[in-house]
Amino acid sequence: MGHDDAHVEAVERAMVALRRSQSRRTLARLAATRRRATVAAAAPGAGVEVLDAIEEAEESGVPATVTSVAAALGIDQPRASKLVAAAVAAGLARREADQADGRRALLVRTPAGRRLSAEVHAFRRQVADRAMAGWSDRDRAQFARLLTRFVESLGAMTR
């Protein structure tokens, strides 16, 4: 295994560990230890992920739909439809008629969904801040830059 292969292997292992550390169960345990259980348990099923997908669409200026949620989450449309329905039933999102195409429903976050999104972002940032406790500002900046670049490269591969 060459020098570069060892680095790629280290990244792959770190990605697996990161994915495990971001599971609903792990985050719920962490939230409970930080007395933030409402953040981890407030959304049904993958409700937080649905809110993330809708928020991403809102920020990009492209209306969110079940199809865009499915693409963002990497799941099929029937599964996305069920997750969206659960988020709507929980009062976190709502469907609105597309004024340009009445057959299409657009998804938007409700005020409750926006509040939950803000809470989740704050919680995730606290977790990241805690994980980087003791890091220098330079290390934090370098990590943020490299991780962002890595994620952008991964995204470009799937488009």
What are these regions (language model features)?
Residues 25-29, 33-36, 123-156:
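Amphipathic alpha-helical dimerization/coiled-coil segments
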Residues 78:
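Key DNA-contact positions within bacterial/archaeal DNA-binding proteins
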Residues 48-55, 115:
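Pre-recognition alpha-helix immediately N-terminal to the DNA-recognition helix
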Residues 1-48:
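N-terminal leader segment of winged-helix/HTH proteins
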Residues 68-71:
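A short acidic, leucine-rich amphipathic alpha-helix
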Residues 85-141:
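Charged, amphipathic alpha-helical coiled-coil/dimerization segments
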